[in-house]
Design a protein with these regions (language model features):
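DPxDG-like acidic metal-binding loop motif
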Residues: 100-124
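Alpha/beta catalytic cores of group-transfer enzymes, especially the acyltransferase/condensing modules
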Residues: 124-168
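Short, hydrophobic/aliphatic alpha-helical segments
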Residues: 82-94, 129-134, 239-249
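ATP-binding N-lobe of GHMP and related small-molecule kinases
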Residues: 1-96
Length: 262
């Protein structure tokens, strides 16, 4: 049996601009800003040679359909041109569906682990591009993998997959702590398919990215994230109440993750 392991951080998007017009899927993505966090997903893959491909995915030990992960496995096995029974075990340390980049982390860590296990010899960016493609096709993310591949507090200046899109980093102290809590899910696929939400994002997202580039700080990122969340209208009363309480206690410009009740 062949085994390999890889890690990918979680990621919180504060605001973004949809950039999915290009025909080339590697040029599709988003401009935006957010932060990668230490907690994420550790993925272990196990492979046994077989007469035909079979894929099993476990999330924290529980069998799951996991279409994004299975899509990554399909891409990687096609490159290997061999058949295997593949078991993928995601050790997930972040909430799923809460806007903390679980789908991107699962996709990227799976691709990294399979690149090792299958001895494909792909570069880091080429591996990340596979995860990016799968996210775009499944409508589970636009720029998350680009951000996760770089880490830190980022501005996604140019859309596209890793190696094509461009990320610049906002300098922060090494002891900076991100405080977040999650109370529910918002399905990214539904949000990206909602024309009304898309129109609101397109109206404001790009302007906020340009504003942050001019004045790049984590304080400005949080301020613009809050403005974005308020203007696209996704904050429910529970989120608004929590943010007010946080601000009363010194957490200035607390905001909402895109997309999740986080």
């Amino acid at each position: 049996m062949i085994t390999a392991k890889a890690y990918c951080p979680g990621h919180i998007t504060g605001f973004f601009e949809i950039c999915d017009q290009p025909k080339d899927i590697l040029k599709k993505g988003s401009r935006g800003a957010g932060v990668s966090i230490e907690r994420g997903i550790i993925t272990t893959v196990s492979l046994r040679p077989a007469s035909q491909n079979l894929v099993k995915v476990l999330i924290n030990g529980i069998k799951s359909e996991a279409p994004v992960t299975k899509s990554v496995v399909k891409h990687m096995l096609k490159l290997a041109n061999k058949n295997f029974i593949v078991t993928v075990n995601h050790d997930v340390k972040i909430p799923i569906g809460a806007g903390i980049g679980a789908s991107g982390a699962g996709a990227f860590s799976t691709a990294l682990a399979l690149n090792k296990a299958l001895n494909l010899g792909l570069t880091y960016d080429k591996v990340a591009q596979i995860a990016h493609i799968v996210e775009i096709v499944n409508k589970t993310g636009l720029g998350t993998v680009l951000a996760q591949s770089r880490g830190g507090v980022e501005i996604r200046v140019k859309p596209g997959a890793p190696g094509i899109g461009h990320v610049d980093l906002i300098p922060v102290d090494s002891d900076t702590v991100i405080v977040c809590g999650s109370n529910g899910q918002i399905e990214t696929k539904k949000m990206l398919s909602n024309l009304e939400i898309r129109e609101k994002i397109e109206r404001i997202g790009g302007k906020l990215v340009d504003e942050l580039i001019i004045n790049a700080s984590i304080e400005k990122l949080m301020e613009l994230s809050k403005r974005f969340a308020m203007e696209i209208g996704l904050m429910n009363e529970r989120i608004k109440k929590v943010i007010k309480e946080l601000e009363k206690n010194g957490f200035v410009n607390a905001s909402m993750a895109m997309f999740g009740e986080t």
